[in-house]
């Protein structure tokens, strides 16, 4: 597969997976190419997105936050209002339908914050498919509510204790499972990561976020926003938000990644700031690694951003400088989590709180009479217990 072929974004992307998965990846790619042109598939996907997920999600003007920050007008693309509470369901439904068309009876997923696991367990229940979710043991603890919901939906949750016991290890275990059960199983990759065609499939299924936001904003304001902001872990909500605006050169695009506790290796998940080119989970991308090329453990207060790699398209957008990626520390994200909750009456996910922090700076720089859209990727019910625990420790 050459760099100019599908699956590459500049030098990033491609398919670097074990040979045992080659046939499955080729089958997935050819099926997806057919389904993209199929009216039946499009109609079915649209039906579920409207009648089950509740799309289109609203574009909300955040009046009090706009006043509080004293800069650009703030708009929120409300992925938190989707069924299951985040953007992850857009992708899970699409991939479950692909699995159904391929005749696969079993679906598996990896999950960090639990939102993708929850979305996969939800579509598994709806389509009557056997569902297994791999989740790092550390994440099972800090995202216990989502872990319980996944089990309640009838999916089997398998805690992963290897390594850091977070998202990277959960992804590795899910890939191992897929390699062993490839004839019966489809792996619903949850972010815009992995070997081709996954980054493209996930991007396409999430691109509804940006398409809707662009048309909703245009309808109300007869122009486009001056800036858009989203948080980036693997980067599926962000690439879904960004994709529709990439050709609009006058729209500034910002990504917020996890600066964690600081710049030392092992303290953050800021792949686009500190990452070097390497290979992880079947793709060529930017990865947090040491001098010897070993992957360094990632850290973030938010389980969904706790990943030492990033989607290859984000690596490309960073390299070409189309998107400005900025780091946000745990502390800064927590402060924004509380501010947005108290000012707007919306509890954002800790992941999204990183985007709010970048948006606050950008809004002040833009000044009044300008407009900024934040992708509110998910709601923060799942984070309340963890935030209260951290605040309790702060006050000791």
Swiss-Prot record:
Its cofactor is pyridoxal 5'-phosphate. Its EC number is 4.2.1.20. The modification N6-(pyridoxal phosphate)lysine is found at residue 88. It catalyses: (1S,2R)-1-C-(indol-3-yl)glycerol 3-phosphate + L-serine = D-glyceraldehyde 3-phosphate + L-tryptophan + H2O. GO terms for cellular component: cytoplasm. PROSITE patterns: TRP_SYNTHASE_BETA (PS00168). One of its GO terms (molecular function) is tryptophan synthase activity. Tetramer of two alpha and two beta chains. Belongs to the TrpB family. This is Tryptophan synthase beta chain. It comes from Leptospira biflexa serovar Patoc (strain Patoc 1 / ATCC 23582 / Paris).
């Amino acid at each position: 597969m050459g760099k100019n072929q599908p699956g590459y974004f500049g030098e990033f992307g491609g398919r670097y997976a074990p040979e045992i998965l080659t046939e499955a990846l080729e089958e997935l790619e050819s099926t997806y190419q057919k389904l993209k042109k199929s009216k039946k598939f499009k109609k079915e996907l649209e039906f579920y997105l409207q009648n089950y997920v509740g799309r289109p999600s609203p574009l909300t003007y955040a009046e009090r936050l706009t006043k509080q920050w004293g800069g650009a007008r703030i708009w929120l693309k409300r992925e938190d209002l989707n069924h299951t509470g985040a953007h992850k369901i857009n992708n899970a439904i699409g991939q479950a339908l692909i699995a159904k068309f391929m005749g696969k009876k079993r679906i598996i997923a990896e999950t960090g914050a639990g939102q993708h696991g929850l979305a996969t367990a939800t579509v598994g229940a709806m389509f009557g498919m056997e569902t297994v979710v791999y989740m790092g043991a550390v994440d099972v603890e800090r995202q216990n509510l989502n872990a319980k919901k996944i089990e309640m939906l009838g999916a089997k949750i398998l805690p992963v204790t290897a390594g850091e016991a977070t998202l990277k290890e959960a992804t590795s275990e899910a890939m191992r499972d897929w390699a062993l059960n490839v004839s019966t199983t489809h792996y619903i990759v949850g972010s815009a990561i992995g070997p081709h065609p996954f980054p493209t499939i996930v991007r396409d299924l999430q691109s509804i976020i940006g398409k809707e936001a662009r048309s909703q904003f245009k309808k109300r304001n007869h122009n486009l926003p001056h800036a858009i902001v989203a948080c980036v872990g693997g980067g599926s909500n962000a690439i879904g938000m960004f994709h529709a605006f990439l050709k609009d050169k006058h729209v500034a695009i910002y990504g917020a990644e996890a600066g964690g506790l600081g710049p030392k290796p092992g303290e953050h998940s800021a792949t686009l700031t500190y990452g070097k080119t390497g290979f992880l989970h079947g793709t060529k991308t930017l990865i947090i690694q040491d001098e010897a090329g070993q992957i360094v453990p990632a850290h973030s207060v938010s389980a969904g951003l706790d990943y030492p790699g990033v989607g290859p398209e984000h690596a490309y957008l960073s390299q070409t400088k189309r998107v400005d990626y900025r780091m946000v520390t745990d502390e800064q994200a927590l402060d924004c989590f509380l501010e947005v909750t108290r000012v707007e009456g919306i509890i954002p996910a800790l992941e999204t709180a990183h985007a709010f922090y970048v948006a606050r700076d950008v809004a002040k720089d833009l000044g009044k009479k300008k407009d900024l859209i934040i992708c509110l990727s998910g709601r923060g019910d799942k984070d309340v217990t963890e935030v209260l625990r951290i605040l309790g420790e702060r006050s000791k």
